[in-house]
């Protein structure tokens, strides 16, 4: 097994070295191909690709090769999407070939990388980046030449779309056809990456580092294997990229990031700066809503008009952002919410960040983001299942039996509240004298959840300081609620509540609550007056679990045991009440 792992590591290292030879460490240009919405012969919006008609044997060969490649790579592409890829990529390959020959370039020094994707908004598009790397050529001249190439490519595709558009709209007047072509040239399927120069007040082609763009941006996408998924369908560079698996892409991306980890967090690279293009058109399938580009629609003099609605610009995240996002994902996956958690579970990353400028601040920011993300996206039950490894639960079941509790019913009660399906009842109250296991169970649940906070009753002015953005809150040996009984009722009522915290902004409390107490907490003393006015509202928000039998567990119980036990729950919540006799073994005496 060890030898197989070594062989696999060597293979990936060789693959990484070979891929770096194919993708040069230099700058080129990048653009998107996007399907544009226009009107068909019935004045209805369409994204249909113009018919692929050509007398060029080279272009026909490119069409066939692209279709064969895409059909073999992914079965979730529609015929129209395949035709769009054939048209755009086929014209690109043919035009590159002509450009290389006319400029007498060495074709082996041309880098073209493309990737067909569907974004989170389900918009179909193709990423392309192109570079030419020859020591005998002036890089500035090469960039200008590549800029001219993109203009030519944009115009060629605009001509195809415009002619098709005019034909189906029966636009025959030369002047109207010229106007239509102008619109397609200005806002057609080709979208170069641009930046705005504040001095000249003009847009220029944005230089893109090919390796960074490929390894960091393109390789971060997952391959699409369902129709509703976002990610990439296929990718290629006429070499290794064509045949990489999703797992290999992720591994190579990590190797590239690790190679540059020395300056990855503070690199002076910001791809967002001035990145104002390409812009994605928010297109729908209804002729009565905002659709496509107004210039294209109006140029055809159709009855359908619309405003240009633009979504957010396509942005290329920086290395700094990618590294931070990678760290945040790792914290989420292993469950790190405090510096202590990170020291134990992600010690290398903690040490690396702590030695950087503003390192402690970065660490605290990432940990806070993970607290917010986890408490918002998943429940305490999900945390227990996600962050722990299963262990034999027999010692836990024996302890629960010794406490006089029915483990099957207790499991249903706990899971109903931990999944926040208990309605207004969002608090578990373990009640009983010392030595009965109430703190043992509460501590086990909180430690298994990992993202938990403690109610600091020692500071009555700010008891919730540690409770913001936690999946579960623990009030240990809770006595009198006093002046914060109203906050407690709001928090245990099942809603998200914001409360004041010491030295911080008001924080959102989203988690369920566990209380351990050997006194009757429904009797509240405010000042010198004890009152039962809050008793009924508190009972409506809590389920009381009486722990009356003294126990002496001889085996340590762990979060892994709790996961094994709770994971056998049938995922069906039950109706809860304040007192539930079904929780206890034998006849209740209270």
UniProtKB/Swiss-Prot annotation:
In the N-terminus, the endonuclease region is involved in binding to the origin of replication. In the middle, there are the ATPase and helicase activities. The C-terminus probably contains a transactivation domain. It holds the Pfam family Amdo_NSP_1-3. A motif (RCR-2) lies at residues 125-127. Its EC number is 3.1.21.-, 3.6.4.12. GO terms for cellular component: viral replication complex. This is Initiator protein NS1. The lineage of its organism: Viruses, Monodnaviria, Shotokuvirae, Cossaviricota, Quintoviricetes. The endonuclease active site can probably bind other divalent cations. Residues 33-263 form the PV NS1-Nuc domain. Multifunctional protein which displays endonuclease and helicase activities required for initiating and directing viral DNA replication. Also plays a role in viral packaging and transactivation of several promoters. Binds site-specifically to 2-3 approximate tandem copies within the origins of replication (Ori), unwinds this hairpin region and nicks one DNA strand thereby initiating the rolling circle replication (RCR). The record marks 227-228, 285-286 as: Cleavage. The gene is NS1. A divalent metal cation binds at residues 117, 125, 127. Its cofactor is Mg(2+). The keyword Mitochondrion does not apply. One of its GO terms (molecular function) is helicase activity. It catalyses: ATP + H2O = ADP + phosphate + H(+). It is an enzyme of class 3 (hydrolase). It is found in: Host nucleus. Belongs to the parvoviruses initiator protein NS1 family. The active site is at 217 (for nuclease activity). ATP binds at residues 432-439. The keyword Transmembrane helix does not apply. Keywords: ATP-binding, Covalent protein-DNA linkage, DNA replication, DNA-binding, Endonuclease, Helicase, Host nucleus, Hydrolase, Magnesium, Metal-binding, Nuclease, Nucleotide-binding, Transcription, Transcription regulation, Viral DNA replication, Viral genome packaging, Viral release from host cell. A motif (RCR-3) lies at residues 217-221. GO terms for biological process: DNA replication; viral DNA genome replication. InterPro entries: ADV_NS1-3, Helicase_SF3_DNA-vir, P-loop_NTPase, Parvovirus_NS1_helicase, Parvovirus_NS1_N, PV_NS1-NUC. Residues 405-560 form the SF3 helicase domain.
């Amino acid at each position: 097994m060890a030898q197989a792992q070594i062989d696999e590591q060597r293979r990936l290292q060789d693959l990484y070295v070979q891929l770096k030879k194919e993708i040069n460490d230099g700058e080129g240009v990048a653009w998107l191909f996007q399907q544009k919405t226009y009107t068909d012969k019935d004045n209805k919006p369409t994204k249909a690709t113009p018919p692929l008609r050509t007398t060029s044997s080279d272009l026909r060969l490119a069409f066939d090769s692209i279709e064969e490649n895409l059909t073999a790579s992914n079965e979730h592409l529609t015929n129209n999407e395949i035709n769009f890829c054939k048209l755009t990529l086929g014209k690109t390959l043919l035009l590159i070939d002509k450009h290389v020959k006319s400029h007498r370039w060495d074709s082996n020094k041309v880098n073209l990388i493309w990737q067909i994707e569907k974004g989170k908004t389900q918009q179909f598009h193709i990423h392309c980046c192109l570079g030419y790397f020859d020591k005998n050529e002036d890089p500035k001249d090469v960039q200008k030449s590549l800029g001219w190439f993109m203009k030519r490519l944009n115009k060629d595709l605009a001509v195809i779309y415009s002619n098709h558009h005019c034909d189906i709209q029966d636009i025959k007047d030369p002047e109207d056809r010229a106007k239509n072509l102008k619109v397609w040239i200005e806002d057609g399927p080709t979208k170069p990456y641009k930046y705005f120069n504040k001095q000249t007040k003009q847009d220029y082609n944005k230089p893109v580092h090919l390796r960074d763009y490929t390894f960091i941006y393109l390789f971060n996408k997952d391959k699409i294997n369902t129709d509703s998924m976002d990610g990439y369908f296929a990718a290629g560079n006429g070499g290794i990229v064509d045949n990489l698996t999703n797992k290999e892409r992720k591994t190579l991306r990590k190797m590239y990031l690790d190679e540059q980890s020395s300056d990855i967090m503070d690199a002076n690279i910001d791809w967002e700066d001035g990145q104002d293009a390409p812009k994605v058109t928010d297109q729908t399938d209804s002729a009565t809503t905002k659709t496509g580009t107004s210039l294209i629609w109006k140029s055809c003099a159709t009855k359908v008009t619309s405003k240009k609605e633009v979504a957010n610009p396509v942005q290329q995240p920086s290395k700094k952002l990618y590294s931070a996002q990678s760290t945040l994902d790792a914290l989420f996956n292993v469950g790190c919410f405090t510096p202590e958690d990170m020291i134990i579970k992600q010690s290398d990353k903690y040490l690396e960040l702590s030695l950087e400028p503003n390192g402690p601040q970065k660490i605290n920011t990432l940990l806070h983001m993970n607290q917010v993300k986890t408490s918002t996206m998943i429940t305490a039950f999900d945390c227990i299942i996600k962050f722990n490894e299963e262990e034999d639960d027999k010692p836990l079941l024996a302890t629960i039996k010794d406490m006089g509790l029915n483990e099957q019913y207790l499991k249903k009660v706990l899971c109903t509240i931990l999944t926040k399906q208990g309605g207004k009842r969002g608090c578990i109250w373990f009640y009983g004298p010392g030595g009965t296991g109430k703190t043992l169970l509460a501590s086990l649940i909180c430690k298994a959840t990992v993202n938990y906070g403690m109610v600091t009753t020692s500071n009555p002015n700010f008891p919730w300081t540690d409770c913001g953005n936690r999946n579960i809150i623990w009030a240990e040996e809770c006595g009198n609620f006093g002046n914060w009984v109203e906050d407690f009722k709001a928090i245990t009522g099942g809603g998200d509540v914001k409360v004041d915290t010491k030295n911080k902004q008001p924080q959102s409390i989203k988690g369920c609550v566990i209380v351990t107490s050997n006194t009757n907490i429904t009797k509240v003393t405010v000042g010198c007056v004890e009152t039962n006015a809050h008793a009924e509202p508190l009972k409506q928000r809590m389920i009381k679990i009486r722990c009356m039998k003294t126990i002496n567990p001889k085996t340590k119980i762990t979060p892994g045991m709790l996961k094994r036990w709770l994971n056998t729950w049938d995922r069906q919540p039950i109706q809860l009440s304040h007192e539930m006799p079904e929780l206890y073994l034998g006849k209740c005496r209270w």
